[in-house]
Amino acid sequence: MTPQQVGAYRQLLIDTIQEKNLQGFYPPQRLDHVLQGMANEVPGKLQRLTHEWSVPMEVATDVMKLSLFDVILYVDDSGSIEFEERGVRKDQLRQIIGIVATAASTFDEDGISVRFMNSMEMGDGIRNAEDVDMLVSRVRFQGLTPLGTNLRNKVLDPMVVGPARTGRLNKPVLVITITDGQPAGEPHDAVADSIRYSIDEVSRSRYGRGAVSFQFTQVGNDTRARDFLSALDEDPMIGNLIDCTSSKYYFLHFFFLSTSEPS
């Protein structure tokens, strides 16, 4: 990799650190260490992604920014995923998990963590589609959609807020929620309340506001789910803290295009 390429990639990561308020995690020495770890592999890996995913280089480049984060997928495993639209939703869900796992593992061998809304099954170090298929095959899709309640119980408290309070958060966390419907079996504002709670908690920690980010991705074509995610996206209190999309490959791109300012 040429010095010019190293400089360009370094600036790309610096811009992301500033835009996403990650300075508490990445002083200059640590950023240099991150770059050294991926140095000679970047051009070839980016070319491979553009070919395999049929996306422009700017979208593939966003994958490199993902190396700054620990990625947690929070997955809706309610009954409608299995039975609505003749199983299409479950296929889409499996595909998205595979895309995220591949993307996150391209420049960081740790892989991603997966937590399910209802099932006690879980996965860590998930790196590719094969890992995803093995994990999803163990999950029984059933029940309602207590999306916000278990977002806090299964993801935010044990994996974000708890470690932030005790100074054990190694990287900022990107929580990607995959769902097919609006929440059910919990208070209407449970999702928004869980997000606000986690933002408040990490903001009081030494890591600051950038310690957690949220992405919501819809599978299926349920209009109520679309309306719910749109309402989250436009919420005056948290809309600038999250990003919602139904795009398959571009959702990571949209996340990195968004800024910390209200839209």
Regions of interest found by a model, annotated:
Residues 1-263:
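Acidic, low-complexity intrinsically disordered regions
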